[in-house]
């Protein structure tokens, strides 16, 4: 019996030692306090702020003179990163409390040309338990005006914008995560839409070790080709004074497209489920006599056809980039915001890309643009920096990386056909079997640019890529919901009950209504 007592005593000492070690480990998890992070030595930059943010504290939003309330408490760290002498990258890292942290890091991308830390998306990420970081891509906006003159005379800032800012932000974030929590993150993910999608794919291609999983929405990855498409549309609508399509005529165009294609999926609901199968011919809209709100003049019809077809090199006959699908022309803040009108966003962005990025001329006139000449020059001179359309993702895939692409079919900013083209390029380059091991594309019917529109636009692609990376369970569909307020996913506001749910099927499959049950419920659809 004595030897049993000795064993029992030894066992008790072992258990006590284990408990002590666990206690020490727990005590060291946050051994670096939030305030102490302000003194942390940072290579290639300096920390400008390290402070606690309490729930309901106001988070400033630049360049707007406003803010939004924090939904949870966290440690806010702001830094200035200077990888070169001409670099000024403002970035932030938000660290949830140790007991709230899910053990993962989420980098978030920007929209437009960046110019401000994407605090809206970071707010949603930290509320879900992620340590999250974002940056301004190396330049600072002072207003909401679309301008790119900050790059003139600053080639290093163009590199920061194109790819470097997100990479050095990921490096600094991981360093401080380990210091704050006492250990590194379990997984690192990145999510971005629009230019953020461009950033996401640049990370996968140029820095495949930065992230374990990436979500790229509506990616502006073929940057120079997309810009050429923007310019093509601007020129088409300004070919003659009569070429402009007024906003008042968009309803007639959409009505005609829906009449031809809405019912193809078995449900007539104002949403074309698969616009790729819609071969809309707008010729019936040609005015028979006098101009009117329900018809198009010949110059307007010519311009519309060019928007649908996409830019073509007149010298070679080769298509430079795809055009836009039909059926969503009259949606608010869609074609009216992005395509038509002298101050459309497409025109504003294209004029800056070619005027500032390519020609370094703040007074450049778009009427001097030659598509064949200038698009080729853009591809040669700035394309190698800006384009993240390389389909060879073998280094990312070899690390076990997972990629989810998504796009709204009603997107009037980045053509959905361009994202499909990139997905097919990956399949061709890497082989379909290999591509299926790490990449999926989800098309969202009725969703506009990144969110909004009549279709379900709220879905958690980050959770899907996390599940895929952690458990090797590839997503074959995403559950998408439509709420009364589309911004609910961004703001973190309680969305209430969804108005519509639908499955987003892994491309090329499309959701089809079974013919029974409510067409507003996802369970009544199948992917095929």
Name each model feature, range by range.
Residues 158, 202-204, 209-312, 443:
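A catalytic-pocket lid/entrance helix-loop region that shapes and gates access to the active site
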Residues 405-407:
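Short beta-strand/loop motif that positions the catalytic acidic residue
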Residues 102, 111-185, 228-229, 236-239, ...:
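Cap/lid segment of the alpha/beta-hydrolase catalytic domain
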Residues 183-194:
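Alpha/beta-hydrolase fold nucleophile elbow
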Residues 13-26:
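Bacterial N-terminal signal peptides
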Residues 116, 192-202:
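Glycine-rich nucleophile elbow surrounding the catalytic serine of serine-hydrolase chemistry
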Residues 438-452, 466, 484-486:
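Histidine-bearing beta->alpha loop at or near hydrolase active sites
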Residues 28-104, 119-120, 267-272, 281-364, ...:
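Catalytic-loop region of hydrolases
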């Amino acid at each position: 019996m004595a030897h049993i007592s000795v064993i029992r005593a030894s066992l008790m000492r072992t258990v006590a030692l284990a408990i002590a070690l666990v206690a020490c480990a727990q005590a060291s998890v946050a051994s670096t306090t939030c305030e102490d992070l302000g003194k942390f030595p940072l290579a290639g930059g300096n920390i400008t702020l390290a402070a606690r943010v309490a729930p309901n504290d106001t988070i400033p939003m630049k360049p707007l003179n406003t803010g939004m309330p924090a939904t949870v408490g966290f440690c806010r760290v702001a830094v200035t990163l200077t990888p070169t002498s001409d670099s000024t990258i403002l970035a932030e890292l938000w660290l949830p409390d140790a007991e709230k942290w899910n053990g993962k890091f989420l980098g978030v991308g920007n929209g437009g040309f960046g110019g401000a830390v994407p605090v809206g998306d970071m707010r949603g990420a930290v509320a879900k338990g992620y340590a999250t970081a974002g940056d301004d891509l190396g330049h600072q906006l002072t207003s909401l005006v679309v301008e790119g003159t900050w790059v003139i005379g600053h080639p290093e800032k163009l590199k920061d914008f194109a790819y470097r800012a997100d990479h050095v932000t990921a490096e600094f974030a991981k360093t401080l995560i380990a210091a704050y929590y006492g250990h590194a993150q379990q997984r690192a993910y990145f999510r971005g839409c629009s230019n953020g999608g461009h950033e996401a794919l640049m990370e996968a291609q140029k820095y495949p070790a930065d992230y374990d999983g990436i979500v790229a929405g509506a990616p502006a990855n073929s940057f120079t080709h997309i810009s050429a498409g923007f310019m093509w549309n601007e020129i088409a609508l300004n070919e003659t004074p009569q070429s402009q399509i007024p906003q008042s005529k968009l309803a007639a165009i959409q009505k005609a497209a829906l009449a031809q294609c809405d019912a193809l999926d078995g449900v007539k609901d104002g949403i074309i489920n698969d616009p790729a199968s819609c071969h809309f011919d707008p010729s019936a809209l040609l005015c028979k006599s006098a101009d009117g709100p329900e018809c198009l003049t010949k110059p307007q019809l010519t311009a519309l056809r060019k928007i649908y077809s996409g830019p073509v090199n007149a010298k070679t006959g080769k298509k430079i980039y795809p055009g836009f699908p039909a059926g969503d022309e009259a949606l608010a803040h869609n074609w009216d915001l992005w395509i038509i009108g002298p101050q459309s966003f497409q025109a504003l962005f294209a004029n800056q890309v070619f005027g500032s990025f390519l020609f370094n001329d703040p007074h450049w006139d778009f009427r001097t643009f030659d598509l064949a000449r200038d698009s080729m020059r853009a591809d040669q001179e700035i394309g190698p920096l800006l384009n993240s359309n390389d389909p060879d993702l073998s280094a990312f895939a070899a690390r076990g990386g997972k990629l989810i692409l998504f796009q709204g079919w009603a997107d009037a900013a980045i053509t959905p056909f361009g994202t499909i083209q990139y997905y097919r390029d990956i399949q061709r380059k890497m082989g379909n079997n290999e591509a299926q091991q790490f990449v999926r594309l989800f098309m969202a019917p009725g969703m506009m640019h990144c969110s909004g529109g009549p279709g379900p636009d709220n879905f958690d692609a980050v959770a899907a890529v996390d599940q895929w990376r952690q458990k090797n369970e590839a997503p074959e569909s995403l559950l998408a919901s439509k709420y009364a307020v589309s911004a609910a996913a961004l703001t973190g506001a309680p969305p209430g009950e969804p108005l519509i749910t639908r499955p987003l099927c892994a491309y090329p499959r499309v959701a089809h209504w079974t013919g029974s049950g409510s067409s507003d419920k996802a369970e009544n659809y199948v992917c095929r």
